[in-house]
Every structure is written in structure tokens, then in C-alpha cells.
Amino acid sequence: MLGAEPGRVLSIQSHVVSGYVGNRAATFPLQTLGYDVDVVNTVQFSNHTGYGYTNGHKTTPEQLAAIFEGLATNGLITHSRVLTGYVPGAAALQVVGEQIEKMKKDNPDCIYVLDPVMGDVGTGLYVSPDVVPIYKDMLRLATVITPNQFEVEYVTEFPVRADDRLLSGVKIDSLATLHAALIQLHTEHSLPHIAFSSIPLPISVVSTLSLPAPPHQYDRLLPTPHPPWFNAVGVGAPDEDVLVCFASSFVDGQLDTWAFALPTIDGYFSGVGDLFSAMVLAHFHPAQTSPLPALPHAVSKALLAVQQILLRTHLYSLSHAGPSGAATPRPLHAAPESVIPTDAELDSAVPLNPKDPRRKAKRMRIRELRVVQERALISQDGVGWPGQRLNWSALLA
């Protein structure tokens, strides 16, 4: 085997022919930032499942093993970084896990970002249940994990009592339960770094953290005044939720946790978590200590790119689709009253042509992340999304 190449990434996740999820959401951004990306596709689908209809096939465990064997035989497993995402079945995930373990044994410094793609709040588990224990076993191999709220709550194990019911896992609805989940993951699974991509917490809780507002680079992209589909950070009733991203490292037996408050866009998008994980991998440099430690630096840079691309994608979708799904171009900075319909309203509206079977597909197509068109946002220099280090002693007192 050749020596590890600093700029070479192995990305193991889903592939779609049309759209930007999985490897399609990760590869181009990583290449834009100068990485050489080798891709293993765990599925080959026509498009993502949000379209309502998709076709294609899953890569079998035997096929995955054959691909890894071919790479190894030719001395091509020289990757210094690995990213894994959606793997649909337990047997296939087991093959992937065994390959990662071999790579970590050969190169302990290999940076591994694990996105344990299992499900989402409101959707539930969308992989086979027997995948979950394999993911739990793979946590020990990861440098960084990037789960969403559902996945965090699913992989935490100790019981929590709520409404006289015994729940399996930690339901994160407060700073105390967040702290408990972080401690468990760091200590029981020897995880050095955790990036919770988004956790909804009540405004009343988030307001105690004194988190910075979005940066100027983001605000300048917004229409003025703010349109109704955009919820600014911290605006609303005390019991309403704010999305917060948390970056936590375990340093000398102590949590070093940073928090980043995120605005909310009322819309449906796919591939956001895949893009976020890729950007965290790209910007994570273990030796970095200034101006931020390695993980909050990577998360800060990732959030700025992802949040800007998400906003530009939403503005584009609003400017190109009316209730019929037909193209109705409008300027990106149109007056708020011209962009009031939400994605849910546009999807449920009576179409002008009800016999058009592709109406939903047209709506989904214009919501695909604009990673190519907005590539300048990926490679931009400068600061990232502002965050704040948490003082756990004070917060839990």
C-alpha cells in the first residue's frame, strides 16, 4: 500500500443520477476545496425518495467487498480522510465498518467523519432496525460524528423517564439532557468530537446562551424586509424552538462545547446533512488551535457555506415556481408579498394542470441544493458562522 495522501478522501454513501444528496452533495464541494475524492456508492438511484417515485438498486455487501478488495490489491487505499453516509442494510454497513477498521489500523491518523444516517424527526427510522447496533459499534472508529436530533436520541442508550413512561435513549429537550447525551457519547464510545447538526430548543433556553446573530455574509442575501417564510434567530414566543448546532470535543476529561444559533427557513430540502458532513470533513484540521479549536472551526466554516446555499436554493425555488409548478421567474429579491407561499402550500395547491403526473417532481427539482451554481460560497475565504463556547458549570448550576 502506498503512503496516506493528505488530500485524498474516500466517500461512502448514496448516489443519485439527478439531484444533490449523498455523494452528489459531497463530492463537488470537496473537490472545490481541493480534495481528491474517491467515491463508493451504496445505492444507485434515479433521484432521492422525496420525489415520491424513484428507481434503481442497492449495492450488495458482496459488491462493496469486491470494490474494497480491488482497491486494496492495487494499493489504492491511500486515503487520509473518510466520510460515510447512507448505507441501507446491516450486512452492507458491516462490510463498510470492517473496511474503516482496517484503514484506521493501517493509519491511526486517518480522519473519519461518520454521519449515522438512520432517520429524522417526523419521519422516523428509514433504515432497517438491525443497522442501529452496527452504527453504535462504529462510533468508536470515528473522529467526528454528525448526527441529527433523531439519530442522537436513537444511539444514546441509558433510559430516561418522561410522563411515567420509560423511554429508550435521551430525549434532548433541555441543556441538561443535551449535556447528558454528550457525556455518554464521549465517554462510553470514546468519541473525541461530536457535531450535532441541528437541535431544536425553546427560545427561552437558547436566549440564556447569548449566541451571536447570523453573519453579514448571510444577511446580505436576504430580501428586505424579512419575508414570512424566514424565522430570524430568537424571534418568537418563549416556547417556540430555535435550531442550534452544537460542536463538542472531549479535552482532558472535560467537555468543550460550542453552540451556533441557526435561522429557520420554512421549506423542504434534501441533502443538507450530507453537505454539512462533507464541509465539516473538509475544514477539520486536528492541529489547529487558533482562532478556534479544530472542531468549532470546521463547524463554523461548514455552517456558513451550508446556510448560504440553503437560503439561495430557497430563494431560487420561490422565484421559479408558482402553485402550478410551472416556471414563473421572479427576481431573487422580490417583495415579500410575492413569495409568501410555503413549500407545503405550493405542494398542496390545486394545480392548473391536474393531469400532470410530474408536478411534484418539478417542485422537487427546483429545490435541489444549488451546490454548483453557488460554488463561490463553498470556496469563500474569511470567517465562518459565529458561535459561542458554553460554560457548562454555570449553565447547569
Language model region names:
Residues 127-255, 265, 284-296, 304:
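Conserved phosphate/ATP/ADP-binding segment of small-molecule kinases
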Residues 55-74:
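Glycine-rich, highly charged phosphate/nucleotide-binding loops
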Residues 103-112, 121, 189-192:
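A short helix->loop->beta-strand "cap" motif at the edges of active sites that frequently abuts
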Residues 290-397:
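Charged C-terminal helix
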Residues 38-42, 111-115, 139-150:
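Non-cysteine beta-strand/loop elements that form the S-adenosyl-L-methionine
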Residues 268-290:
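Short, small-residue alpha-helix embedded
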